[in-house]
C-alpha cells in the first residue's frame, strides 16, 4: 500500500493522495488530532456493484465505514461536527430499497458514541432518473431526487450558527415586514404568537432542513449566491480535459459543502474531507477563508481536482501526482 503524499497545497490547505486509513498515520495529519472543526464528506455510496470511484459493497461497506468512525471522530475539536452525505441504495436486481445506508450510519454513530444533531435532505430535482431499470425502463418506481445529510458531533451543542446561512424572506414575510402587522394570538396548536415577535427584519429567515440549490430555487442563502451557477464545475471540467483525465462521476454540489462550512465553522477554522473526490469541500473552504485538509485515494481524481483552485497554489517540488506536463518547444 502506497504511502500518502501531499499532491498540492495552497496557503490554507493540502490535498493528500492516499487512502484515509494510511493518511491518518502521517505525522502532519496526526498533529491535527482534536483540531478539526468540521469533517464534511460524502463517502463512496454503498452501491450493489463496484463503481470506478472505489466504493465498497454490501456488508463490507458497513464494516468499513464503522471502522473509520473512531479514528475520524478523534480528529474533531471538542465542539466540532462531522457531516456525512449518504445516498440511497437499492437491492441487486430488485425494485426494493436497501437499508444498508441507514445501518451503516447507525453503526458509525454508535461506534464513536456520537450525537445526531440533525437530519438534512439535499433535494436536486435535476438528478438523472435512477435506478434506471425501475424508473425509466419498467416504470415501477419514482425518480430518486435527494440524498441524506447527517450532522453529528461529540457533544449535544457543537459550534453552529444558523444566522450565517439565512435564506431570503418569502413574499408574504416581506409584505408583513412592510405593513408591520399580522394576526397574533392563540393558534389551534396551542401556540401563543406574540404581537411583535415577527416584526423585526433579521436579514433573512432560518433555513429549513430541506436544501435545494438548483437554479430555480428561490430560497438559497444569500451568503452562498457566489457559488450558484455552473462556473465552479466548468473550470474543473475544462482542466480535466486539458490534463486528459476523467472527471469524477459523482461530484458533490459545491453549494452543499459551502452551506455546512458557513453554518458550522468560522473563518480560519479547519475543515477536513477524508473522501475528497474532486475536492469540492476543499475548494469551498478555500473560497470561504477556512483552512482545509483533503484526502483522496484515486490519483486521477487528485490530478483533476487541481482545476478547482486556479491561482491559489503554493510551490510543490516535483510532479507528485503525475500531472500532465506542458511540452517543451525550446
Which residue ranges define each predicted feature?
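Core catalytic lobe of class I
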Residues: 1-304, 311-312, 329
Amino acid at each position: 500500500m502506497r504511502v500518502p503524499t501531499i499532491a498540492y497545497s495552497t496557503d490554507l490547505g493540502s490535498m493528500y493522495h492516499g487512502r484515509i486509513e494510511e493518511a491518518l498515520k502521517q505525522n502532519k495529519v496526526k498533529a491535527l488530532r482534536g483540531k478539526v472543526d468540521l469533517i464534511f464528506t460524502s463517502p463512496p455510496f454503498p452501491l450493489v456493484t463496484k463503481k470506478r470511484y472505489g466504493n465498497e459493497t454490501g456488508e463490507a461497506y458497513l464494516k468499513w465505514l464503522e471502522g473509520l468512525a473512531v479514528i475520524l471522530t478523534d480528529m474533531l475539536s471538542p465542539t466540532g461536527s462531522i457531516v456525512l452525505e449518504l445516498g440511497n441504495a437499492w437491492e441487486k436486481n430488485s425494485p426494493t430499497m436497501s437499508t444498508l445506508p441507514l445501518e451503516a450510519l447507525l453503526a458509525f454513530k454508535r461506534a464513536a458514541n456520537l450525537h445526531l444533531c440533525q437530519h438534512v435532505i439535499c433535494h436536486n430535482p435535476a438528478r438523472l432518473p435512477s435506478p434506471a431499470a425501475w424508473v425509466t425502463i419498467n416504470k415501477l418506481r419514482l425518480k430518486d431526487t435527494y440524498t441524506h445529510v447527517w450532522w453529528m458531533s461529540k457533544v449535544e451543542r457543537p459550534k453552529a450558527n444558523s444566522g450565517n446561512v439565512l435564506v431570503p424572506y418569502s413574499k408574504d414575510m416581506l409584505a408583513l415586514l412592510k405593513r408591520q402587522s399580522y394576526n397574533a394570538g392563540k393558534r389551534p396548536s396551542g401556540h401563543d404568537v406574540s404581537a411583535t415577535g415577527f416584526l423585526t427584519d433579521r436579514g433573512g429567515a432560518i433555513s429549513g432542513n430541506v436544501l435545494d440549490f438548483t437554479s430555480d430555487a428561490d430560497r438559497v442563502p444569500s451568503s452562498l449566491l457566489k457559488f450558484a451557477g455552473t462556473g465552479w464545475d466548468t473550470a474543473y471540467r475544462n482542466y480535466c480535459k486539458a490534463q486528459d483525465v476523467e472527471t469524477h462521476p459523482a461530484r458533490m454540489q459545491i453549494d452543499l459543502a459551502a452551506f455546512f462550512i458557513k453554518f458550522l465553522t468560522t473563518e480560519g477554522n479547519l475543515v477536513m474531507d477524508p473522501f475528497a473526490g474532486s475536492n469540492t469541500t476543499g475548494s469551498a473552504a478555500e473560497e470561504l477563508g477556512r483552512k482545509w485538509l483533503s484526502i483522496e485515494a484515486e490519483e486521477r481524481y487528485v490530478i483533476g481536482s487541481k482545476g478547482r483552485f486556479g491561482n491559489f497554489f503554493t510551490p510543490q517540488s516535483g510532479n507528485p501526482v503525475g500531472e500532465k506536463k506542458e511540452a517543451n518547444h525550446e
